[in-house]
Amino acid sequence: MYNIIAPLYDKINGELDYSSWADFIEENVRRYGPDMPTELVLDLGCGTGRMTLELARRGYDMTGVDGSAEMLNIARAEAERAGLSKKMLWLLQDLTSFELYGTVELAVSCLDTVNHITTTGELKQFLSLVHNYLVPDGLLLFDINGKRKFEQIYGDSSYVMEEEGAFCVWQNSYDKKSRICEFYITLFQKNEDGRYVRYDELGAERMYTIRSMKKALSDCGFELIGAYSDFKFTEATDDSERIYITARCKK
C-alpha cells in the first residue's frame, strides 16, 4: 500500500522526532549490545529512509530494506542530497524473504513495520531471517502499535491528507476478534498534464500482545530484553499506544 502514498508518507509522519528515536536506539546498544563495535546496521521497512539517514549521519554503515520501489526512490534521492550515498545500500525486498551479503551488529524496524506482518507464520519467517543475519548477541529493535492505537486511534476512523499534487483519503476498519485493522486508501495524483489519476489500495496491520511477541521471538532464537512505552525505558503494557521492543539474538 505504501507505493501509492509514498509522496505523502513524510508529511503523515512529519512530527516524529527521529533524533530522539536514534538516541534511544544508541542507548539500547550501549546497555545491551554485543561486545564489539556496532558498525553495520540493518533498517527493515526503511520507507523513505528517514531513520536510515539519521543513523548514517551518526557514522553507521546502513542497509535499508523495503518492499516499495517508490519509497526507496525517495530514500535514494534524500541520501544523495545529504551526501550519504556511500554509506547506504538500498534493497527492494520483501521482509519475509530478504537476503543480505553478510551479518550485521544491529537490526532496527521503525514505525510499526512489524504490525504489517499479519500472520504468525510470516512473523516467524521475518524474525528467523533477522536472527540469521545478526551476529551473536546482536540486537533487534522494533516498535509495534498497541491496543490503544488500534482501538482508539485507528478504530473505524477516516482521514484526509493533502500535499501539492496529491490528495489521499484513508479509511480504517478494525476487527477486535481477529485484531486486524484494514486500511482502504484512495489517492488522487496530479499528472504533468494537470489531470488527476485515481489509485486505490488495501493494507492491513495486526495487533500483537507483548506475550505473543515474546513467544514468537523466543521461538526464533531471540531473548526479549524489554518492552517500553517511550524513549525513557518505561515498561509498556498491551494498552500502550506504541510499544518499543528490545530483543537479543542468541546463538
Q: Where are the model-predicted features located?
A:
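A short glycine-rich, Lys/Arg-flanked "PGG" loop and its adjoining helix->strand segment in the class I
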Residues: 124-136
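C-terminal lobe and adjacent flexible extensions of AdoMet/dcAdoMet transferase-like proteins
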Residues: 204-251
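Conserved class I S-adenosyl-L-methionine
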Residues: 1-36
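Residues lining the SAM
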Residues: 110-112
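Class I SAM-dependent methyltransferase SAM/SAH-binding core
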Residues: 40-42, 49-97
